[in-house]
């Protein structure tokens, strides 16, 4: 079982969610999860996420939504118009401390879930891994370089599938300038 985007699913309950994943793993369950290193999420405005009650469920307002095509913050009127039109929004809804808690956790991997890149798109489309190395390793010291590389490469998945040990199997190689 893989739980996607634990940070944007759990929000302020990230600590509880991380402990639940850790407890399940300690009991031998094959469960993984990932976080992305941004305080904003991104999705299509026409999705069911924005059905009636979305403001109460997420604890945000129209102004916390940013229309990707123009960069503008939404109002009740522009929300209705753009929702009918269809398109992508950036959702400003997470606190930096929630993100750092998720990134630091030994039970998480780093995921980007980047959408096809377009001007104004969520930065995770191109900058997720550089952000982890720059902000959480170099600047904040929240992770060691070794731990960060383990979180951003498919090493965990290769170990789980056994491909890291099989002769002739592909192995990830990351080359970068730090």
Put a short name on every predicted segment.
Residues 39, 117, 151, 166-167:
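Residue-level signal for alpha-helical context at structural boundaries
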Residues 2-142:
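Active-site neighborhoods of metal-dependent hydrolases
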Residues 106, 155-156:
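Alpha-helix boundary/capping residues
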Residues 129, 152-153:
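N-terminal alpha-helical segment
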Residues 90-93, 99, 140-150, 157-178:
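Acidic, glycine-enriched loop/beta-strand segments at the rims
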């Amino acid at each position: 079982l893989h739980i996607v985007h634990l940070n944007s699913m759990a929000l302020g309950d990230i600590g509880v969610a991380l402990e639940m994943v850790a407890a399940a793993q300690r009991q031998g369950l094959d469960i993984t999860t990932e976080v992305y290193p941004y305080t904003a999420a991104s999705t299509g405005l026409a999705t069911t996420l924005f059905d009636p009650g979305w403001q109460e469920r997420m604890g945000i307002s129209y102004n916390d939504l940013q229309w990707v095509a123009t960069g503008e913050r939404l109002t009740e009127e522009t929300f209705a118009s753009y929702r009918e039109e269809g398109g992508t929004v950036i959702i400003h809804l997470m606190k930096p401390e929630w993100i750092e808690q998720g990134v630091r956790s030994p039970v998480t991997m780093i995921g980007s879930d980047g959408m096809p890149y377009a001007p104004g798109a969520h930065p995770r489309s191109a900058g997720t891994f550089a952000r982890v190395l720059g902000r959480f390793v170099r600047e904040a010291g929240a992770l060691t370089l070794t731990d960060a590389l383990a979180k951003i490469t498919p090493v965990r998945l290769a170990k789980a599938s056994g491909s890291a040990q099989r002769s002739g199997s592909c192995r990830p190689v990351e080359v970068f300038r730090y």
